[in-house]
């Protein structure tokens, strides 16, 4: 059974189509990055998945309709939107008490074990913690819930690089396994590239690319080309071209790397560079990627 399956998923706000006919399937044991510019439909998609907004089309999350079966669904789903959602007046111990009282699959002992690895005291109030410590507290609570699906919407927004790294390290080492699925949105794409198993690019309410990381590595190639070889490189029909330190960087889709290596240095593009090429719309050829 798919964890998430959407067919023709739509959501409109007046004349604005926040989601415009999305088809998506997410299997067990995947870490999916949902990537798009502001206003692309990322948060609306997550809200639909979490049963926080109505929708048109067909959407099943863990086999349930999230809008009509949300109470049952949320027993198997955890969500982090932003660390600021924790009340500033509450003590750490009281936060654990509260979650234990409302969520039947919360393991308080496990949350306390996670917190022993931090400098957070159980008697501290949230307002006494740094933003990074609040993120650690929130993650400890979420990881102590035995959920099959974890949804993260900009979970490290505003944190410094050290806390961001600790956040994702804890997520991978202490929570993720092949029986769980994670969906994450973030603007810090370069920091989660090595964490993801799959990516979805969304723009203007439509999905423009769905790919596993393995497929990206085999399908897309960047070539750094000197001026002398630029015409030969362009003849191979790159989908995107940019300049870097006096050299041309061309992005190719399904072009043999051996041919590209003969005219320049080759590498797999970063997710950020691929996103700019596909979603930026700066090359007419990029439209061939739209699904």
Regions found by a protein language model. Give the residues of each.
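ABC-family P-loop ATPase nucleotide-binding domains
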Residues: 81-138
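Catalytic Walker B motif of ABC-type/P-loop ATPase nucleotide-binding domains
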Residues: 150-154, 159
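C-terminal coupling/interaction segments
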Residues: 240, 244-291
């Amino acid at each position: 059974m798919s964890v998430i399956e959407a067919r023709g998923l739509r959501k409109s706000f007046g004349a604005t189509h926040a989601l415009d006919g999305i088809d998506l399937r997410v299997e067990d044991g995947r870490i999916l990055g949902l990537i798009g510019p502001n206003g692309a439909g990322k948060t609306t998609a997550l809200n639909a998945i979490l049963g926080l907004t109505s929708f048109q089309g067909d959407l099943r999350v863990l086999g349930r309709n999230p809008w009509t079966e949300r109470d049952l669904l949320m027993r198997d789903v955890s969500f982090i939107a932003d660390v600021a959602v924790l009340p500033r007046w509450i003590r750490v111990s009281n936060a654990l008490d509260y979650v234990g009282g409302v969520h039947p699959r919360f393991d308080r002992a496990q949350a306390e074990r996670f917190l022993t690895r931090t400098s957070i005291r159980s008697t501290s109030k949230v307002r006494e913690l740094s933003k990074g410590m609040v993120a650690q507290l929130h993650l400890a609570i979420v990881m102590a819930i035995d959920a099959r699906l974890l949804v993260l919407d900009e979970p490290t927004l505003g944190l410094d690089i050290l806390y961001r790294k600790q956040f994702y390290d804890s997520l991978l080492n202490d929570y993720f396994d092949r029986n769980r699925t994670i969906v994450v949105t973030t603007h810090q794409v370069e920091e989660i590239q090595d964490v993801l198993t799959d990516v979805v690019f969304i723009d203007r309410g439509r999905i423009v690319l769905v790919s596993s990381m393995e497929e990206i590595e085999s399908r897309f190639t960047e070539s750094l080309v000197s001026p002398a070889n630029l015409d030969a490189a362009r003849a191979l029909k790159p989908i995107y071209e940019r300049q870097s330190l006096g050299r041309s960087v061309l992005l190719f889709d399904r072009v043999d790397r051996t041919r590209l290596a003969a005219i320049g240095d080759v590498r797999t593009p970063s997710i950020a560079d691929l996103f700019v090429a596909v979603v930026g719309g700066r090359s007419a050829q990029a439209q061939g990627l739209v699904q």
